[in-house]
Amino acid sequence: MLSIVVLLLLMAEGSSQNYTGNPVICMGHHAVANGTMVKTLTDDQVEVVTAQELVESQNLPELCPSPLRLVDGQTCDIVNGALGSPGCDHLNGAEWDVFIERPSAVDTCYPFDVPDYQSLRSILANNGKFEFIAEEFQWSTVKQNGKSGACKRANINDFFNRLNWLVKSDGNAYPLQNLTKINNGDYARLYIWGVHHPSTDTEQTNLYKNNPGRVTVSTKTSQTSVVPNIGSRPLVRGQSGRISFYWTIVEPGDLIVFNTIGNLIAPRGHYKLNNQKKSTILNTAVPIGSCVSRCHTDKGSLSRTKPFQNISRIAIGDCPKYVKQGSLKLATGMRNIPEKASRGLFGAIAGFIENGWQGLIDGWYGFRHQNAEGTGTAADLKSTQAAIDQINGKLNRLIEKTNEKYHQIEKEFEQVEGRIQDLEKYVEDTKIDLWSYNAEFLVALENQHTIDVADSEMNKLFERVRRQLRENAEDKGNGCFEIFHKCDNNCIESIRNGTYDHDIYRDEAINNRFQIQGVKLTQGYKDIILWISFSISCFLLVALLLAFILWACQNGNIRCQICI
């Protein structure tokens, strides 16, 4: 059996070197055994030679501190950092692009609430820096620097270090306080102040003498007036009283007035606001590492090599857009038509209409030929480069279309009614649905264009060769031409590079074409004549047989008897 196989291989090899038919040249395109399926405008499953995944599905398990500056709040959230709670001293003067709030952050001072918490949190985060400017406040006939056992610093009773707790004087006096601060600077000031709510009337009079107290804070355009809400509450860090913190922004040229007869938690200064800063905040437990990335999510940092991601809808920085799809593939190669097995011992060749060529690795398009000198394959770099020039940069163009700074944070509503929260969620979901649809459509459109461009360049190559050969060759209908004149490898090369001279071979090609067509016609008539001759012979044999039977019956040599 082995000897038979060897013999067949030798015959096939020998045949390629002793080819006696007309030269044949075929146009073809690159193919691979297993391509990649992509979606186009007209088909959900089109196999292409190569494709690139556009949806990022992997992230780093850490946050990258470069090039964006990250500040880790550790046990402090951003509001406690601004108030100056114990344990937040590491945030003094901190500056950030992204403030990292930890889910494990806790309050470490007197129990408090902020009626407009999210707005204050957003202002502080966007400011990008804790730049506190201390000021002198002249409070008369009151005791300052109140402390609490709920707010210990180094095991000593203390308080928020950015605020001043005012209580009655040792002489049991808390006269009306009326203090004005004018903003003569060129930046807006953020003042944070508070109102203490004692748990009992006794506590109220012990601390402030006056019952009820009152705090009013005004600017030229706003006024906030608060009367303490006295009442018993659950103990938190040993305290049933509470503090409500408020904030006021004073623009340049404006002023702020503090008016109180008790219960004021006064500021010790203000925070400088920077309207040009575009910083933000991220709540996550992911640790900060030593990597480099411009995009952060609550799951970790991402690279920006792909235009889309489906890791998290919470994304900060220069990030891929979040989409619902787990995969979107961009075609970066032509339609894939895997090559068929060689047919017969003589390795019949076929062009692009029947299949692609897996051996064509130097280009997308190329030639195969068969002539008296053998067979060969060569890439056509001109058509390949023309297609690549149009297709290259698709990924960059796609990224440019989605390259705007993308900052999407899930809102945290604490004290707004559920209908607003539901509306916000609906808007965010609708935005994501829209982006997901746009992404899928955009990729399908680009894929359709890629395949159309690739097919167009293949057709251009075929037409270029056809115009060169003209009547010197015949289109075989499968992407190949049968050439009607002798065409050695130099001749084949001239067809490939576009220098083929049709006139040189014209007379030879016409003569050979007529001879070949005449042989074909003669062979056709021969078949017809054979069939006619066979039919006449059969007819004559039957006629002779009938004549013999009639003659024999007349002479009595054969008697026919018919019975009914």
From Swiss-Prot:
InterPro entries in the record: Capsid_hemagglutn, Hemagglutn_HA1_a/b_dom_sf, Hemagglutn_influenz_A, Hemagglutn_influenz_A/B
Subcellular location: Virion membrane; Host apical cell membrane
Site (Cleavage) location in chain: R343, G344
Transmembrane residue ranges: 528-548
Alphabetized UniProt keyword annotations: Clathrin- and caveolin-independent endocytosis of virus by host, Clathrin-mediated endocytosis of virus by host, Disulfide bond, Fusion of virus membrane with host endosomal membrane, Fusion of virus membrane with host membrane, Glycoprotein, Hemagglutinin, Host cell membrane, Host membrane, Host-virus interaction, Lipoprotein, Membrane, Palmitate, Signal, Transmembrane, Transmembrane helix, Viral attachment to host cell, Viral envelope protein, Viral penetration into host cytoplasm, Virion, Virus endocytosis by host, Virus entry into host cell
Signal peptide: 1-16
Gene Ontology BP annotations: clathrin-dependent endocytosis of virus by host cell; fusion of virus membrane with host endosome membrane; fusion of virus membrane with host plasma membrane; viral budding from plasma membrane; virion attachment to host cell
Main localization (coarse): virion
S-palmitoyl cysteine-type lipidated residues: C553, C560, C563
Positions of disulphide bridges: C26-C480, C64-C291, C76-C88, C109-C151, C295-C319, C487-C491
Topological domain ranges for the Cytoplasmic compartment: 549-564
Posttranslational mods: Palmitoylated.
Extracellular side: 17-527
Glycosylation-annotated residues: N18, N34, N178, N310, N497
Molecular function via GO: host cell surface receptor binding
GO cellular component, one term: viral envelope
Xref: HAMAP family: INFV_HEMA
Miscellaneous information on this protein: Major glycoprotein, comprises over 80% of the envelope proteins present in virus particle. The extent of infection into host organism is determined by HA. Influenza viruses bud from the apical surface of polarized epithelial cells (e.g. bronchial epithelial cells) into lumen of lungs and are therefore usually pneumotropic. The reason is that HA is cleaved by tryptase clara which is restricted to lungs. However, HAs of H5 and H7 pantropic avian viruses subtypes can be cleaved by furin and subtilisin-type enzymes, allowing the virus to grow in other organs than lungs.
Family: Belongs to the influenza viruses hemagglutinin family.
Biological role: Binds to sialic acid-containing receptors on the cell surface, bringing about the attachment of the virus particle to the cell. This attachment induces virion internalization of about two third of the virus particles through clathrin-dependent endocytosis and about one third through a clathrin- and caveolin-independent pathway. Plays a major role in the determination of host range restriction and virulence. Class I viral fusion protein. Binds to sialic acid-containing receptors on the cell surface, bringing about the attachment of the virus particle to the cell. This attachment induces virion internalization either through clathrin-dependent endocytosis or through clathrin- and caveolin-independent pathway. Plays a major role in the determination of host range restriction and virulence. Class I viral fusion protein. Responsible for penetration of the virus into the cell cytoplasm by mediating the fusion of the membrane of the endocytosed virus particle with the endosomal membrane.
Oligomeric form and interacting partners: Homotrimer of disulfide-linked HA1-HA2.
Protein name per Swiss-Prot or TrEMBL: Hemagglutinin
